[in-house]
Amino acid sequence: LIFHEKMSGATKGYALIRLNFKSHIFEIRRIAITDKGRGYGKESMKGLIRYAFEKTDTNRLWLDVYPDNEIGIKLYESLGMHCDGVLRQNYLAERGYLDQIIYSILRSEYAEGKYTD
């Protein structure tokens, strides 16, 4: 998915998603925003969450984030996402093994208003 600014139509980022139709799981594999600190990331995440629960049969939306991505973690928590746990040393990068934190939100939480728009 490509994110565009409403007024200018300029591309501001993208997301790679995977939707498992059998288990109704919506995974955000990657989200990248070009102009950081301007609210595009938050608006993009809000749009993805709304899309997942209002336009598809999604029961659970989830993503993973590295512990050093403090801005991302604050964003996901501000949107009502729940920390499911940590996959310790789950990814081998140039700088060594990295943990991955799993965040998710369920359809029931979205419907109850636990999602913060």
Feature-to-residue mapping (PLM):
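Acetyl-CoA-dependent GNAT
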Residues: 1-36, 51, 55-56, 106-110
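Short glycine/proline-centered loop/turn elements that form peptide/ligand docking sites
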Residues: 41, 45, 68-72, 89-94
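Conserved acetyl-CoA-binding loop-helix of GNAT-fold acetyltransferases
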Residues: 33, 38-52, 73-78
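Terminal substrate-recognition subdomain of acyl/acetyltransferases
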Residues: 96-117
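Conserved active-site tyrosine of GNAT-family acetyltransferases
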Residues: 76, 81, 103
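Conserved catalytic-core motifs of GNAT/GCN5-like acyltransferases
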Residues: 62-64, 82-99
